[in-house]
Amino acid sequence: VLSGTGLPTSVFSRPRYLILLATLCCLLWGSAYPAIKGGYALLGIARSDTAAQLVFAGWRFLLAGALLLVMAQLTGRRVWALAPVQWAQLGLLGLAQTALQYVFFYVGLANTTGVKGSILNATGTFFSVLLAHFLYANDRLSRRKALGCAVGFAGVMVVNLRGGTQGLDAGFTLLGEGFIVIAAFVLSAASIYGKRLSQRIDPMVMTGWQLGIGGLVLLLGGLAGGGDIRGWSAGSLALLGYMAVLSAVAFTLWAALLKHNRVGQVTVFNFLIPVFGALLSALFLGEAVLEWRNLAALVMVCGGIWLVTTEAQAPRPVSSST
């Protein structure tokens, strides 16, 4: 039986492959940090130019969605033969998981510090665990899971306090810190909604449409807001292409992992993203990678993941059917 990614379903439900594939997804998403910074530098996009950032993100996700849909079509998947209700569901998923989430995130990031933005964005894992607790009987919140999330979140804080507490204060504004938290919640809720849709729609097709629809909305919204990107070069196009590919691969694998595993066991790996982002950014910027903060954060995040993923599985009920 195939999972919708071309890989056997059993691959995604085995613990060792869950760890490997979820870590790969987070490594790819973490690599987007230096790639985005590099793209902004090559295209002259200012940190405060939210409209241009939305245009850049729109192209990234639109291309990622197109790549997935072409691949799905070539491998014989049902790309167009969907019921009207499924089109509506995919539209809602694309608007929420890609478009709405990124609008909140980019606007929020423009109105707060990078340190606070990264830390608050990590609250998405808590939202996912809490939502799963109320939606799935086999994914209840436990002391071990809560401890694992707390340890992982502490690791995210450690990797972000590179300059001491600079950029970290008690200030809170709706357009800044508030929007970052809203973005994290929207992404968590949309991911769980996507988990439900993936039971009836091929994960590759689902991811392709949600990225494509969301990317188109971001692109049009950015252009309507005055976003203007000029001076495309071979380097900036290569970076855009890389980000489109990483998005296509990571989001498809993530959707398949969520389909075949409990939410908490997958989303706890999200704590790795800012750690990988910091490590890869330091590597490409020529900074010291083997800082104690980076190593301590990696150990803490891995410890949190271990606590959650090694939690005793609830026994499956024996089917009464013959």
Functional labels for PLM-detected ranges:
Residues A35-S48, A110, N160-T173, G222-L239, ...:
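Membrane-interface helix termini and inter-helical loops of multi-pass transporters
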Residues L68, L130-L131, R143-G163, F271, ...:
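Hydrophobic transmembrane alpha-helices of multi-pass small-molecule transport proteins
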Residues L2-G58, L95, D169-R196, L220, ...:
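Glycine-/small-residue-enriched transmembrane alpha-helix faces in small-molecule transporters
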Residues A52-A64, L109-T125, T173-F185, S233-S247, ...:
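Structural signature of hydrophobic alpha-helical transmembrane segments
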